[in-house]
Amino acid sequence: MTWQTYLKDHQSRFVDELLDFVRIPSVSAKDEHFDDVVRAGHWVVERLTQAGIENVRLMETETHPVVYGDWLHAGSDKPTVLIYGHFDVQPAEPFELWESPPFEPVVIDDTVRGRGASDDKGGMLIPILAAEALLATEGKLPVNVKFFFEGQEEIGSPTLAPFIAENAKLLQADMIFSADGGQWDENQPNMIIGLKGLVGCEITVSGAKGDQHSGMQGGGIANPIPCAFTYHCLDERAGWENHG
């Protein structure tokens, strides 16, 4: 049996597993779902182990946990690839706008619909399935592989940097493949050359406290919102020419 045949023959099981994974409301932004994020991490541990990955473990950080596993038998002459993904998801509110409950996933037109089905539970599950298929049919992987999945990506990975620094040797690799992204079609991936971080801010503007009479004011009255936009466009560092 080839790995392609293996994937095809087990497709229905893989879909059921993704549905089971998406049912876990692992919303990292909400304290009430902390245990759910941990539960999702344990789900990943079990799934990696089932796939034949070794040294699999849930590792604590100062906030949400990470999951690590590896298969390092390709040989010292082969590169080591670290595969990254995340098992936490965004909040699903407002729930009333969903056609079906976000944590009760359904399959419609061959598409799994539920919170996190794409970002990133479906994405991170694919390399696990690929490794399982290769190990089941060929008994080996073409390269050494490390898996590193986190549970805090959707909140900006606030405690991931110190964890990585403390575990630099464990996570050392020749290249990193992110399973948190997209590709153009089944056979054509895309390459992302940069990612933006998160910015949170609060802007307070003030203007007239009530309606103004043109006869009393004798001219135009500045509206702070369009004025701010105009000033922004005049800024050569972030002006209109840089925004289309």
Region locations from a protein language model:
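Acidic-enriched catalytic cores of C-N bond-cleaving enzymes acting on peptides and small amides
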Residues: W184, I193, S214-G244
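Acidic/histidine-rich catalytic neighborhood of metal-dependent amide-processing enzymes
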Residues: S118-G194
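Flexible glycine/proline-rich, aromatic-decorated loop/lid segments
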Residues: N190-S206
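Short small-residue beta-strand/loop micro-motif enriched in glycine and branched aliphatics
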Residues: V112-G114, K209-G215
